[in-house]
């Protein structure tokens, strides 16, 4: 940082100023100015503590608090005079404070280093971001629950290997993502609990000889406690790494849902139609309706995972305590949160407005011998057949149906009896896709009754109207 005479605030031992390129690579203001509110909050708490401990006079603290009021008002009004040559938000705030109140501004940094100042701001910002992102995820969950509630009995094919497996209900399918997102939200909340320790007072790395009260500043900033080791306090970035890990996992779940939207809205599947709000066209092919938002979510999920890997790579070989490698931790973290939150908003909008096609889903569910397991189960229940024998018999019946080009429900009884003579007309009662889905009544299963129960539980948990 440069003072009014152009001298860097850390430049007392240097004979020359940094080159323009050095200033360019060293500057972080464009990124960390987002922590302005957190920086001012940290300075307020620090100044109050210094005054309480008699390190700072009451008059100086009053001047500092008044100056910080003016600083934050300027920032909120968009009139704060940011100066890029001052490197970062922390030095910009201090320089402006000095312009506003004079000498007392220079006392604010007593018993504090930029090392503990920066990481305090970063923890405060990340804690708030985790809470905001968790609320967005809950909003997407609520939207999925609403759409599931509309489709508790809508039958569609369930897939393994992207091949028709068994009939399921659309409501059940959508609730699977609600469960995934709940784990994602839980990880975000857990991360917020672990990061909620205050590094302020660790100073550069070894603590300070001033009689500070770290419990006081921790409480003022809403932290559970001060961090117990000053080296760890300024060195640790695992809280950011954990946040990016949680975002990466959650983004992976968004990507899976996005991929299914791409598939379902294709003419080959025809299960759904995206609204015009969430579709784009082609510059040459007038008939096209492209699911660009879903495709972009897939791509951006990879970007978030890349940010996690980049931060992990930056941290993995760093000795204690601080190194400038850590400056980009905020660039990666801020962009990961921004990107993820954008994806959640886009996905919520798509789910809210997507039109499902129950008839097409039902027709697809009836193909591919999706009720073969139901036939095998019937052989076990009604004829007392061991399941492995029933599996073999069913396979032979499927082969006959395939040879005749019909589904199991349309295969004549005599064809089934040619495989096993004890099969009766009653078998057809389990071979419709509706009967198949309805029969899956175990806890967590796909029957409309079970799905309705799950919807009711989620409505209560998420307070969905």
Swiss-Prot record:
One function term, GO molecular function aspect: argininosuccinate lyase activity
Show the Gene3D superfamilies listed in the entry.
Fumarase/aspartase (C-terminal domain), Fumarase/aspartase (Central domain), Fumarase/aspartase (N-terminal domain)
Catalytic activity, reaction form: 2-(N(omega)-L-arginino)succinate = fumarate + L-arginine
Q: Which SUPFAM superfamilies match?
A: L-aspartase-like
The protein's Enzyme Commission number? 4.3.2.1
Pfam families named among the record's database cross-references = ASL_C2, Lyase_1
Superkingdom of source: Bacteria
Q: Which GO terms describe its cellular component?
A: cytosol
Question: Which pathway does it serve?
Answer: Amino-acid biosynthesis; L-arginine biosynthesis; L-arginine from L-ornithine and carbamoyl phosphate: step 3/3
Instruction: Alphabetically list the UniProt keywords.
Output: Amino-acid biosynthesis, Arginine biosynthesis, Cytoplasm, Lyase
Q: Where in the cell is it found?
A: Cytoplasm
Which InterPro entries does this chain map to?
A: Arg_succ_lyase_C, Argininosuccinate_lyase, Fumarase/histidase_N, Fumarate_lyase_CS, Fumarate_lyase_fam, Fumarate_lyase_N, L-Aspartase-like
Q: Which GO terms describe its biological process?
A: arginine biosynthetic process via ornithine; L-arginine biosynthetic process
Q: Does the keyword Transferase apply?
A: no
- Which HAMAP family has this protein been placed in? Arg_succ_lyase
Protein family according to the UniProt entry: Belongs to the lyase 1 family. Argininosuccinate lyase subfamily.
Name this protein carries in UniProt: Argininosuccinate lyase
State the encoding gene.
argH
